[in-house]
């Protein structure tokens, strides 16, 4: 026997490969209040038992690797390993299972969404034993929530800053999204804000291109919003997109926005990354700036039902990383979004405590403790005829954002803004009087048209515009 063999035998180390389920499938495990809990939709390869697939997810996203290693003996795997503690078959789907995994809190760096995602979804999605894998939900324990700053300000502070209460906020994305000069861009901002909108917005891919450098855009937009504020007596904002190629450049743009005295900046949090987003959120908290978040690239990650990460997880991650607004779909517009699923993650964005509710896709009860809420932003293919439904679906604590539905008005940008403001005020008034927006919505809009020619013109233009496509991501039966 060689010295090497003698050494291995003497420490009881047995090399080789063993099934994951022998170590990481623990149906007897009782979850702890401090565990991060995950619900994965697992589609195993043919011949792979669901218990082995669920255990493989737990192993590869925590302490495991493909073979036994001698350094396992230098730590306590029982303390640090992830555990697949329950598996459910998905009704109506062949070979799909929900695998529940518990992770000890010590596996994660405090205050770092980047580290949390690197661990839980960083490597396991390419695992050959799985045909497909989707992270459906996470339960973030209060002990971990308290390590995050979260949104720079939150819903109530934003309302106080803007002095706007009792209704949804109104916004507009400036179109065309690319190609305008900074001066023409600022002109559109001014006209929309003067017409009655609360916000205008840079589109997600407006950064600092040759046709419009960021500093020029910031200057003209600031001039526009201050002029609109003076004329209307209302506080206005424009989401100045600070997203950039480096964190240093991003912060430089946010600093310039603060020096101009504007109330809000913007970030593309998925393409920009969670580290950049958290950095910007901390700057905004320290310097009194609101932070609007765009979810560009989300559908690459969340749209397919059997693979990726559900948006409710990305929404939770954003609330932890930091943002005062985030785009959340519309239910009624041009973009993907089933009603019950959308309302489920809207509640996860806004509320302090959300109960488990599988009918809305919420797998775990979530307690946000004292983390501020985030305003959901309904944007994408919406117009004045959608206003009753949007007001009823999203309620007061939301931003309703009409891009083409403002700038596409036949009389111009300011009349388009007037039409949207009149429609919103009519819907809020009707709701407060006890009328049913879902049933009487069209009638409410027609009544308002009688005293608003701008709204009447908008209603005529968009009276036949609908987006009747079934959602791809729907609830399980």
UniProtKB/Swiss-Prot annotation:
It catalyses: 2 (2R)-3-phosphoglycerate + 2 H(+) = D-ribulose 1,5-bisphosphate + CO2 + H2O; D-ribulose 1,5-bisphosphate + O2 = 2-phosphoglycolate + (2R)-3-phosphoglycerate + 2 H(+). The modification N6,N6,N6-trimethyllysine is found at residue 14. Pfam families: RuBisCO_large (PF00016), RuBisCO_large_N (PF02788). Binds 1 Mg(2+) ion per subunit. Belongs to the RuBisCO large chain family. Type I subfamily. The modification N-acetylproline is found at residue 3. Keywords: Acetylation, Calvin cycle, Carbon dioxide fixation, Chloroplast, Disulfide bond, Lyase, Magnesium, Metal-binding, Methylation, Monooxygenase, Oxidoreductase, Photorespiration, Photosynthesis, Plastid. GO terms for cellular component: chloroplast. The gene is rbcL. Substrate binds at residues 123, 173, 177, 295, 327, 379. Its EC number is 4.1.1.39. InterPro entries: RuBisCO, RuBisCo_large_chain_AS, RuBisCO_lsu_C, RuBisCO_lsu_C_sf, RuBisCO_lsu_fd_N, RuBisCO_lsu_N_sf, RuBisCO_lsuI. This is Ribulose bisphosphate carboxylase large chain. The active site is at 175 (proton acceptor), 294 (proton acceptor). The basic functional RuBisCO is composed of a large chain homodimer in a 'head-to-tail' conformation. In form I RuBisCO this homodimer is arranged in a barrel-like tetramer with the small subunits forming a tetrameric 'cap' on each end of the 'barrel'. RuBisCO catalyzes two reactions: the carboxylation of D-ribulose 1,5-bisphosphate, the primary event in carbon dioxide fixation, as well as the oxidative fragmentation of the pentose substrate in the photorespiration process. Both reactions occur simultaneously and in competition at the same active site. Heterohexadecamer of 8 large chains and 8 small chains; disulfide-linked. The disulfide link is formed within the large subunit homodimers. It is found in: Plastid, Chloroplast. HAMAP family: RuBisCO_L_type1 (MF_01338). It is an enzyme of class 4 (lyase). One of its GO terms (molecular function) is monooxygenase activity. Coiled coil: none annotated. Its cofactor is Mg(2+). Its main location: plastid. It comes from Solanum lycopersicum (Tomato).
């Amino acid at each position: 026997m060689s010295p090497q063999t003698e050494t291995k035998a003497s420490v009881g180390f047995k090399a080789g490969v063993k099934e994951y389920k022998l170590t990481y499938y623990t149906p007897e495990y009782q979850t702890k209040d401090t565990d991060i809990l995950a619900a994965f939709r697992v589609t195993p390869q043919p011949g792979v038992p669901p218990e082995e697939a669920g255990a493989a997810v737990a192993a590869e996203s925590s302490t495991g690797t493909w073979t036994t290693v001698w350094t396992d003996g230098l730590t306590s795997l029982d303390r640090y390993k992830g555990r697949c503690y329950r598996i459910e078959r998905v009704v109506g789907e062949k070979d799909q299972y929900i695998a529940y995994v518990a992770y000890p809190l010590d596996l994660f760096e405090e205050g770092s969404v980047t580290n949390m995602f690197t661990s839980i979804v960083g490597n396991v999605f390419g695992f050959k034993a799985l045909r497909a894998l989707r992270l459906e939900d996470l339960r973030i324990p209060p002990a971990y929530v308290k390590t995050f700053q979260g949104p720079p300000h939150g819903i109530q502070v934003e309302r106080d800053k803007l002095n706007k209460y009792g209704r949804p906020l109104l916004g507009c994305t400036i179109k065309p999204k690319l190609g305008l000069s900074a001066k023409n861009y600022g002109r559109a901002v001014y006209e929309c804000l003067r017409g009655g909108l609360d916000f205008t917005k840079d589109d997600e891919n407006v950064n600092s291109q040759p046709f419009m450098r960021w500093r020029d855009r910031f200057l003209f937009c600031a001039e526009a919003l201050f002029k609109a504020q003076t004329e209307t007596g209302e506080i206005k904002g424009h989401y100045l997109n600070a997203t950039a190629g480096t964190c240093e450049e991003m912060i430089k743009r946010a600093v310039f926005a603060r020096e101009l005295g504007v109330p809000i900046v913007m970030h593309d949090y998925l393409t920009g990354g969670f580290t950049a987003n958290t950095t910007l959120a901390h700057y905004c908290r320290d310097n009194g700036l609101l932070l609007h978040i765009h979810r560009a690239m989300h559908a690459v990650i969340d749209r397919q039902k059997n693979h990726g990460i559900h948006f409710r997880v990305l929404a939770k991650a954003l609330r932890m990383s930091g943002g005062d607004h985030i785009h959340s779909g519309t239910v009624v517009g041009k973009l993907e979004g089933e009603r019950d699923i959308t309302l489920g993650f809207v509640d996860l964005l806004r509320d302090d405590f959300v109960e488990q509710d599988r009918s809305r896709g919420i797998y775990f009860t979530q307690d946000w403790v004292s983390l501020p809420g985030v305003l959901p932003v309904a944007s994408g293919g919406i117009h004045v005829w959608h206003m009753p439904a949007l007001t009823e679906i999203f309620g007061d604590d939301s931003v309703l954002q009409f891009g083409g539905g403002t700038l596409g008005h036949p009389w111009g940008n300011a009349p388009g803004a007037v039409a949207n403001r009149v429609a919103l005020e009519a819907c809020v008034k009707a709701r407060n009087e006890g009328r049913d927006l879902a049933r009487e919505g069209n009638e409410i809009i027609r009544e308002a048209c009688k005293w608003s020619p701008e709204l009447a013109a908008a209603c005529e233009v968009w009276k036949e515009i609908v987006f009747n496509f079934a959602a791809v991501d729907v609830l399980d039966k």
